[in-house]
UniProtKB/Swiss-Prot annotation:
Binds to the 23S rRNA. The keyword Lipid metabolism does not apply. Keywords: Ribonucleoprotein, Ribosomal protein, RNA-binding, rRNA-binding. InterPro entries: Ribosomal_bL9 (IPR000244), Ribosomal_bL9/RNase_H1_N (IPR009027), Ribosomal_bL9_bac/chp (IPR020594), Ribosomal_bL9_C (IPR020069), Ribosomal_bL9_C_sf (IPR036791), Ribosomal_bL9_N (IPR020070), Ribosomal_bL9_N_sf (IPR036935). GO terms for molecular function: rRNA binding; structural constituent of ribosome. GO terms for cellular component: cytosolic large ribosomal subunit. Gene3D superfamilies: Ribosomal protein L9, C-terminal domain, Ribosomal protein L9, N-terminal domain. This is Large ribosomal subunit protein bL9. SUPFAM superfamilies: L9 N-domain-like, Ribosomal protein L9 C-domain. Belongs to the bacterial ribosomal protein bL9 family. GO terms for biological process: translation. Pfam families: Ribosomal_L9_C (PF03948), Ribosomal_L9_N (PF01281). It comes from Synechocystis sp. (strain ATCC 27184 / PCC 6803 / Kazusa).
Amino acid sequence: MAKRVKVVLNETINKLGFTGDLVEVAPGYARNYLIPKGLGVVATPGILRQVEQRRLKELERLKAEKDAAEARKVALETIGRFVIKKQVGEAEAIFGTVTTQEVADAVEAATNQSLDRRGISLPDIHKTGFYQAQIKLHPEVIATVEVQVAPL
């Protein structure tokens, strides 16, 4: 009897592997737990080809997402500056602060592209002026734009 059996995982299992991974496990673990519960299948050449095809499709999808994010970055950095108008008090201090939602709304108004406010990082803004904002469009793509806070 074989000491280890190769299994392709259908689901992520803690301390074993992720979906689509080829892992070697004890025959009893595969026969009595993984296969009956649908968590894995015995690795055959056909199954391995299917897993490889899925992996290639996933890589293509991830590359397409990154390319789209790069295009959005170029578009945002071409515009470069977004203006946010706020009510101003003494010494050019604004009432309240500039929020990430306001920046997202300004970007959407200028580009017709919606942004998730959680991907925007701003310094603390309490006065009028120019500030740098970083917009995370993808885990590997970050656009830097200028935010101008102007009096209303």
